[in-house]
Every structure is written in structure tokens, then in C-alpha cells.
Amino acid sequence: MSTLVNAASRDALAATELQLLQATDGAAAAEITGLADELFGVAELLRREATLRRALADASTDPRTREDLARGLLADRLGGRALPVVVEAVRSRWSSAKDLISGLERLARTALLVQAERAGRLDAVEDELFRLGRIIGGQVDLERLLSDPTTSAEGKATVVDQLISGKVEEVTQSLVRQLVTHPQGRVSDGLEELAELSAKRRERSVAHVRSATPLSEEQQQRLASTLQRIYSRPIALHLEVDPDLGGGLLVRVGDEIIDGSVAGRLQSLRRDLAD
């Protein structure tokens, strides 16, 4: 797995994760699995097609140009849940084409973890990923085989199925299969990162809310209800009044930021005008 260290790419990921959460809102498990598969598929397409990859990640072009290109090429290939996520991704500013691919893969993994979370199985997935990382890391030959980027992806996926099929959660199996298909470094390290990603999702139960004016009780209840629907768990609100926002709300849940403030919209407009 690849960690996004550039600030622009982290901001792009945060914006696209918000779109992902909206896409999964009210979705059945099979729909979320399909969404994840399609995001993995787009990442694979960009990995193969260098010209397309560069065009969709070119921050010097107008975001609308990148959006039109993505819609023209992918609208017939993607479902109604995946397409808006991909569009948001290509409209965003990534530091490199590699980060765009890594971001799409991260979003696909997050979708699968959301599925496990809503089924009440996120704890189990986290534990399985952690234990598999330790098991594979302790077997030198297996680690070498699964981490080798020159080894057949299909062959490695078959090995994974033989090892864990029927023994772990379906989400766990899907995550491991995808990880070994395109390993970036040691698979055991990738599994540890996935376990950490799972743990972060479990910890996202507090929303830090900044508003230009105090929220009424009714507004607080409505916001808490909306966030609970998005995150599939009760969300406690930590409220702060910040007149500099000008209006609207700025909500942070874990690493995810929902910026509906006037100041945020103006800043976004300035970035678009500068592109």
C-alpha cells in the first residue's frame, strides 16, 4: 500500500472520501462491493493506460476538462454510485498520477470497510487483517511469493483463496486478494496498514463541528442524525462557534472534513479560478 504524504493529495482524498460516503449511503452490501470493484477497476485501467493516467491527473488543466474526459470514457462502464466518486477524484488536485491511482485504491478499500462496519463486522475484519499480516510475515517463502510484483496476479489470488476462503470475512478476503494483485512492498506491511485503516474507522465516533453562529437544539439533532446515517453509528457532537466561517458548517470526523462553510466555498472558488 502507498501512503499519501503530499498535502494536495491528502486534501483530494478527503474530498473524494466525502463523495464516497454519500455514494454508500443507503446502499446494500452487494452495491458497496460492486462500487469497490469498479473503483479497483478504474485504478487498474489508469495503471495500464499511461496517456489516460496523465490526462486525468494533470493539475494544470481545468477540472471540468478532466471531468468531461472521465465521463466520456467511463460513464458506460461504471454504475451510478461509482461514477460520481471517480468524477470527484479526477476533479481534485493530486500531486501525481501515482497518487491518483493510490487514492482510488484507498477509496475502494474504504468502501469495503464501510460495508463491514454497517454489518457490525469491522472488529472481526481488523483482527483478521492483523493476524494474517503476522502469519504471512512469519513465512518467508509465502511472503516473497505474494509480495513479488512479477508473479502472476491471478496465481497469487488463487493462493490467497486456498489459504483463507471460508475462514475469514468476505471483506477480509477481498481486501487481501486486491492487495496481493498489486503489492507495493511487503504484503505483511500492507496488511498491517489495512488493519490500521480499519481501526481508524472504528474510532470515528466524534464530530468536531465549527459554525458561524450557535446551533439550535433542533439543528444539532438534525446534524447528529445525518452523520449517524452516513457513518452507521451514533456520533457525538463537539461544538465550536467561529464567526470567521461567515456562515454554514465545518465538520471534522476523524481525518474526514465536510466543509459547508462560506469561507470554505470561497476558498474552493479561489482554487478553481487559479487552475
Swiss-Prot record:
Q: What is its main location?
A: membrane
Topology in membrane: Peripheral membrane protein
* SUPFAM superfamilies listed in its UniProt record: N-terminal domain of the delta subunit of the F1F0-ATP synthase (SSF47928)
Q: Which GO terms describe its cellular component?
A: plasma membrane; proton-transporting ATP synthase complex
- Write one Gene Ontology MF term: proton-transporting ATP synthase activity, rotational mechanism
Q: Which UniProt keywords apply?
A: ATP synthesis, Cell membrane, CF(1), Hydrogen ion transport, Ion transport, Membrane, Transport
Concerning PROSITE patterns, the annotation shows:
ATPASE_DELTA
The keyword Chloroplast appears for this protein: no
In terms of Pfam families, this protein maps to:
OSCP
| Record localization | Cell membrane
> Cell membrane: present as a keyword of the record?
yes
Xref: Gene3D superfamilies: N-terminal domain of the delta subunit of the F1F0-ATP synthase
Its job: F(1)F(0) ATP synthase produces ATP from ADP in the presence of a proton or sodium gradient. F-type ATPases consist of two structural domains, F(1) containing the extramembraneous catalytic core and F(0) containing the membrane proton channel, linked together by a central stalk and a peripheral stalk. During catalysis, ATP synthesis in the catalytic domain of F(1) is coupled via a rotary mechanism of the central stalk subunits to proton translocation.
Subunit architecture = F-type ATPases have 2 components, F(1) - the catalytic core - and F(0) - the membrane proton channel. F(1) has five subunits: alpha(3), beta(3), gamma(1), delta(1), epsilon(1). F(0) has three main subunits: a(1), b(2) and c(10-14). The alpha and beta chains form an alternating ring which encloses part of the gamma chain. F(1) is attached to F(0) by a central stalk formed by the gamma and epsilon chains, while a peripheral stalk is formed by the delta and b chains.
The family annotation for this protein states:
Belongs to the ATPase delta chain family.
- Cite the NCBIfam families for this sequence: ATP_synt_delta (TIGR01145), PRK13430.1 (NF009967)
Q: What is the protein name given in its UniProt record? A: ATP synthase subunit delta
Report the source organism.
Saccharopolyspora erythraea (strain ATCC 11635 / DSM 40517 / JCM 4748 / NBRC 13426 / NCIMB 8594 / NRRL 2338)
